[in-house]
């Protein structure tokens, strides 16, 4: 069986934070869902939520025993990107490094293609 390239990277830092949050919720069925919606100052914005289920066509990326889930519509905007977790002066948050974004807003939560 040939290896299939995963179109989205789920970093160790993000996976470890998800693992911690799932442990706090005491629900091992939870997965981090990343999605794109219209809005924000640049046209599209990233969203993050926890979800117990997956839907037909969802991409599932696993790291350290936890799962990142992306729906097919959102995935087309995220191919080649990285979902990471950062802690700094601006606070702690999940972030998306998206090579498809032509512009991003200052807070990094919205982008345009």
Curated annotation (Swiss-Prot):
Keywords: Iron, Iron-sulfur, Metal-binding. The keyword Iron-sulfur applies. InterPro entries: FeS_biogenesis, FeS_cluster_insertion, FeS_cluster_insertion_CS, FeS_cluster_insertion_RrpA, HesB-like_dom_sf. Iron-sulfur cluster binds at residues 41, 105, 107. Binds 1 iron-sulfur cluster per subunit. It comes from the Bacteria. GO terms for molecular function: 2 iron, 2 sulfur cluster binding; 4 iron, 4 sulfur cluster binding; iron ion binding. One of its GO terms (biological process) is iron-sulfur cluster assembly. GO terms for cellular component: cytosol. Belongs to the HesB/IscA family. Required for insertion of 4Fe-4S clusters for at least IspG. HAMAP family: Fe_S_insert_ErpA. Homodimer. This is Iron-sulfur cluster insertion protein ErpA. The lineage of its organism: Bacteria, Pseudomonadati, Pseudomonadota, Gammaproteobacteria, Pasteurellales.
